[in-house]
Amino acid sequence: YVRTLSLLQDQVPPRPWAEMRPVIERELGGSVDALYAEFDREAIAAASLAQVYRARLHDGTDVAVKVQYPGVAALVRHDLDALRLLVNIWAKFEQVIDFRPVVDEMERNAPEEVDFVHEGQAAERVAALLADRDDVLIPRIYWDRSSKRVLTMDYIDGIKISDVDAQRAAGIDTPRVADTLIDLFNTMILERGMFHADPHPGNLFVVPNEVEGEPARIGLVDFGLTKTLPDEFREQ
């Protein structure tokens, strides 16, 4: 089950370009050819809500363009309604395990996860909180090429964090990567009070350092689900 469901991280069968191009052009108000100097029509990753393309801006910057599937907000609402019905039925027969709070949390998060403006703003806030760390990469957002359903950001050229063999082949110290990842999330949660709340392998990359001998960095993407913790909660 884990192996099969893990495909949802970034290996969902992609939607055809003919279906996704109109989303970009409608959201950004121009043709793809005018908006970007280059745009690869083949998606480099596809997940449950959107798929990602590689492109290049007119100034030569390599970017990733995240495009939401048409009609996904309505589908999410339909799925949540179905889940609500199921957990309400479950609650009539099961008194020990109550799944209703889980669906409550999903319903609170859903509007933010399908709003890429929220995602971009969250990425910028976390980047500001971690600006003193040189072991993490968070993509810059290009707001003139972004909207609620399209998000253009720096392309992070990294190795999926679960691909340990590729990391070792690149000469990366994998135990040190693990230490960095733990320290990074401890910093976000316990010190800075805002953290990336969806750290599955499709959202975490290991980026070899350009400086020889320096440790690899952690690349974080997809800030659609972030959480903020009050000071009092963190202190407790």
Identify the function of each model-found stretch.
Residues G193, D198-H200:
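Conserved catalytic-loop position in the HRD/HxD motif
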Residues Y1-M188, G193, V206-D231, E235-Q236:
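Broad phosphate/nucleotide-binding scaffolds in NTP-utilizing and phosphate-metabolizing enzymes
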